[in-house]
Amino acid sequence: MLFRSLLNDNPDNYYQNCVIDGSYDYRIFGTRGTVDWFSMGSKGSSTDVAVMVDTGYIDSSQMEFAPDGSFEIIASATKQPGNWLPLAPTSRSIIVRQTFGDRKAEKIAEIQIECLNPDKPNNNLTPEALERGLMGAAGFVKNIGNMTIAWEELYRQHINQLPSDDQERCQRAGGDPSIHYYQSYWKLADDEAMFVQLDDIPECQTWNLQLSNYWMESLDYRFFKVSTNKHTAHYEPDGSVNIVIAAHDPGPKYPNWLNTLGHGEGGMLGRYVGASVFPKEMKSRIVKLSELS
């Protein structure tokens, strides 16, 4: 399986992306699987991450499924009965987020897509089309790099804090409209820890907090605990959650330890998914590791 980490990609997500043209109609179909939740959003660009504005949205809580878990969605500019993903003439991509509660235990939805009204096929590759494709790919890489640097400089203005982010900016970069983002930057000495206390968790589909490196690439969640969420976290008797971010295990009193994996600084991102109210911040403070023992 190919892994691509960028812009604080969610360790709880399985991402899928498809280039489309909003002037056509598409049938998206498949089987539900057991993944906790998934969403599909049509976006206004497939290569420029600065203008990937939302042009349509649907998620599994809004969909109808057959008894065997199969489903069908029509993606089009014209409203359709049943499961419908709106498109606009400017739509250029569809992004799928399959969000796990427990990644190791759940099965992803199997999804396919077909165009319902394609033009007559033309497989003749022209020099102009090749140039557009290559320049688009190069532009995507350049835009990602520039955006990463710009965002990290911005988030270092509130280092080791988790305030509510600029949601409009997140959406322009391809964010999910059902997610409220808390994006920031952490920096810790070897003997320090960041103590995050979630004592006002809203009613939501799920929530999570993750760590990334300087380049906003998620740390290796395949083999290490670098994130936690609604389903995997340990809760206190009062329903709150205490999370410790540190280079060293703070001990059994703090089961929600996120390992910085040798990094001294990097990005971090908290999310509330499907909530209607949001705290202004995820509360945090810096402590010495020795204070936690």
Per-segment meaning from a language model:
Residues M1-S293:
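A compositional/structural signature for long, glycine/proline-rich flexible linkers
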